[in-house]
Design a protein with these regions (language model features):
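Sec/Tat-exported extracytoplasmic proteins
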Residues: 80, 89, 105-109, 137, ...
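N-terminal "domain-start" segment that seeds a small globular fold
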Residues: 43-75, 92, 99
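Short loop/turn microsegments at loop-to-beta-strand junctions
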Residues: 58-59, 81, 179-181
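Short active-site neighborhood of thiol/selenol oxidoreductases, capturing the structured segment around
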Residues: 71-101, 115
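Structural microenvironment flanking redox-active thiols in thiol-disulfide oxidoreductases
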Residues: 98-157
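N-terminal targeting signals for export/organelle localization
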Residues: 1-60, 219
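Structural micro-motif
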Residues: 144, 155, 162-168, 176-183
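Thiol-/selenol-based redox modules, centered on thioredoxin-like
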Residues: 170-219
Length: 219
């Protein structure tokens, strides 16, 4: 008599491809961000050996910051600092400029480099308004100040001090027309570089030169 043995097929569960794709999609931006950060650091290291020119000295000034406290040349004395000119209701480039400025915080976090944003619409940009704007951007509040004050002083500071264009817009609702450049200032108050905040390599060049200054003028 012939005995037949029944065979049992064992199926291995198929991998959940949906989960794998979700994990992959989550990892892609993280890996991309890491690679871009690494590439920026490589560029910074290459550029940071170039000599820096001098463009004149920033005149003494005193304005008011987002906390309604006096802030100016005295508080910046002996520091390397970076300036920009913006206004909080800007319909044009200011959000990009401020975002790019915020990108400087992490790579310069232990350097002591100070960030300073001057409002070119001081009548609307009161300390209270600047504080709300600043809170959305600052990771280290003690290292980034937003300044307001008399229009005449800020206009003169932009045009005569930093050599940056500033004028009234053709349409009142569009606000002032101002420079989109970052300005690098050394410990002596001398301007050492200008950088287009809207250019793809603007932040990279600025970081490189800031690192150069930190070596040239250690604390």
């Amino acid at each position: 008599m012939k005995t037949e043995t029944a065979s049992v097929a064992v199926r291995t569960p198929a991998p959940k491809s949906g989960t794998a794709w979700k994990v992959t999609l989550l990892l892609i931006p993280l890996v991309t961000a890491g690679v871009l950060f690494w590439l920026r650091q490589v560029q910074v290291n290459v550029l940071s050996n170039r000599p820096l020119p001098s463009y004149g000295t920033v005149p003494s000034f005193e304005l008011v910051n987002q906390d309604a406290q006096p802030f100016g040349s005295r508080q910046l004395s002996g520091k390397i600092w970076i300036a920009d000119f913006i206004f909080t209701s800007c319909p044009g480039p200011c959000p990009i400029i401020s975002t790019r400025m915020s990108e400087l915080q992490k790579p310069l976090s232990k350097s002591g480099v100070h960030l300073v944003s001057f409002s070119v619409d001081p009548e609307k940009d009161t300390p209270e308004v600047l504080r709300v704007y600043a809170d959305k951007l600052r990771k280290e509040p003690l290292r980034w100040d937003f300044l307001t004050g008399p229009t005449a002083i800020i206009t003169s500071l932009s045009r005569d001090g930093f050599k940056l264009a500033l004028s009234e817009g053709e349409q009142p609702e569009s606000g002032p027309i101002h420079s989109t450049r970052f300005v690098l200032v050394d410990r002596r108050g001398t301007i050492r570089g200008y950088y287009d905040a809207l250019a793809p390599d603007g932040v990279t060049k600025l970081l490189a030169d800031a690192n150069h200054l930190l070596r040239e003028q250690p604390k």
